[in-house]
């Protein structure tokens, strides 16, 4: 295992980038380039998706968050300002999806609105009548996955 450790253990993000992706590519018949790699997560996993993909856009070309948002950040400056240059971001990320339930107030819709105002291309899905729950995330998954096979 090739990761940096502190007294809390290995960085989850380093494990994904340095260990999991190479293991998957070595073990399974995958396309190993960024053009064929996406990451998605639900709830805290949605936030982890941002924290994994955005600093490593050389490894991913699509991302999805299901009830995952970043709290208390300026979207123009977070992740070294990756969203500030919408043209560059949109060229690098082929598909971005953010979904949530209509009955949850988790910040997803607010963040999506801010990204739209910056010119970031993304699809937003609001699951009708659902909360921060599995039905929301199953619906988000159903909306997200078909887009991964369009480019």
Predicted regions and their residues:
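Non-catalytic cap/lid and distal C-terminal segments of serine-dependent acyl enzymes
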Residues: 1-151
């Amino acid at each position: 295992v090739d990761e940096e450790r502190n007294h809390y253990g290995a960085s989850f993000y380093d494990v994904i980038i340095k260990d999991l992706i190479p293991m998957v590519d070595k073990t399974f018949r995958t396309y190993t380039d960024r053009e064929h790699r996406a990451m998605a997560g639900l709830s805290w996993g949605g936030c982890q998706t941002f924290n994994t993909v955005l600093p490593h856009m050389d490894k991913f070309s699509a991302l999805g968050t299901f009830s995952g948002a970043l709290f208390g950040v300026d979207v123009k400056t977070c992740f070294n300002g990756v969203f500030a240059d919408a043209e560059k971001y949109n060229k690098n990320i082929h598909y971005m999806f953010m979904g949530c339930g209509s009955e949850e107030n988790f910040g997803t819709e607010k963040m999506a609105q801010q990204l739209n105002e910056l010119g970031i291309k993304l699809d937003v899905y609001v699951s009708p009548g659902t909360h921060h729950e599995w039905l929301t995330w199953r619906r988000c998954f159903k909306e997200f996955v078909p887009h991964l096979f369009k480019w």
